[in-house]
């Protein structure tokens, strides 16, 4: 089964995300468990945790249908020891929040070398940061997102992702979230059925489909290979529709959250319905 949804607002409490997902016809969703643009946040209240779990149970959302995202401030490959320590502490806090909510994934951008250390050294720091956090937690899988490669961001190439996974000691608790817009911006051509098949064959060969835990389903305002991160609605922009047809008709994308981060939330319900319509009977 395809689990399709969007990154919904947690305004007013994480327990409110479930109703927002249901309102757009979703059977998957993403959320922030805290303000994504602040380092510190109040702990989740027991009341919020109970309400979230109860709402998920009533609506039929299991942990594998939900893809929490961490703060944009965190940089697990930070070249400065103080910045790295701050990022690691914040990342562990995010994992602990997922633990409290009974969730099994935490999606995150790997980090950036900031032009201060070699790329390879920063990739090693990211893997070491993941190991550090996993040793201090349980039950939550660290889900690395491929990036557009904007600036000095790591994780834009399949080789980067494979290197990061290779450095993680507990392979059962690491995975990948594949973002269609980011891949396109990074130079992976998803515009035709043939090129889609090739990209996903390369992904399987270099990274491995066994590590795919979720996807971000996005159109692209950016141009191909531009290394610029600019999302668009699914049927607008430069990416085209071939990749969405491919995803909806390939059972390797079953059973994982397929999450919209498209730019017009007023049409998320329509986009979800359209994606479902692409599946061949």
UniProtKB/Swiss-Prot annotation:
Cofactor: record remark: Binds 3 Zn(2+) ions.
Record-listed E.C. numbers: 3.1.21.2
Catalytic activity: Endonucleolytic cleavage to 5'-phosphooligonucleotide end-products
Keywords per UniProt: DNA damage, DNA repair, Endonuclease, Hydrolase, Metal-binding, Nuclease, Zinc
Requisite cofactors: Zn(2+)
SMART domains with a match to the protein in the record: AP2Ec
Single Gene Ontology BP annotation: base-excision repair
InterPro entries listed in its UniProt record: AP_endonuc_2, AP_endonuc_F2_Zn_BS, Xyl_isomerase-like_sf, Xyl_isomerase-like_TIM-brl
Superkingdom of the source species: Bacteria
Entry GO MF terms: deoxyribonuclease IV (phage-T4-induced) activity; DNA binding; DNA-(apurinic or apyrimidinic site) endonuclease activity; phosphoric diester hydrolase activity; zinc ion binding
Residues reported in the UniProt entry to bind Zn(2+) 2: 145, 179, 216, 261
Chain positions recorded as Zn(2+) 3 binding sites: 182, 229, 231
Xref: Pfam families: AP_endonuc_2
Residues that coordinate or bind Zn(2+) 1: 69, 109, 145
Top enzyme category: hydrolase
Function field: Endonuclease IV plays a role in DNA repair. It cleaves phosphodiester bonds at apurinic or apyrimidinic (AP) sites, generating a 3'-hydroxyl group and a 5'-terminal sugar phosphate.
Family per record: Belongs to the AP endonuclease 2 family.
Protein name as annotated: Probable endonuclease 4
Organism whose genome encodes this protein: Aeromonas salmonicida (strain A449)
Higher taxonomy: Bacteria, Pseudomonadati, Pseudomonadota, Gammaproteobacteria, Aeromonadales
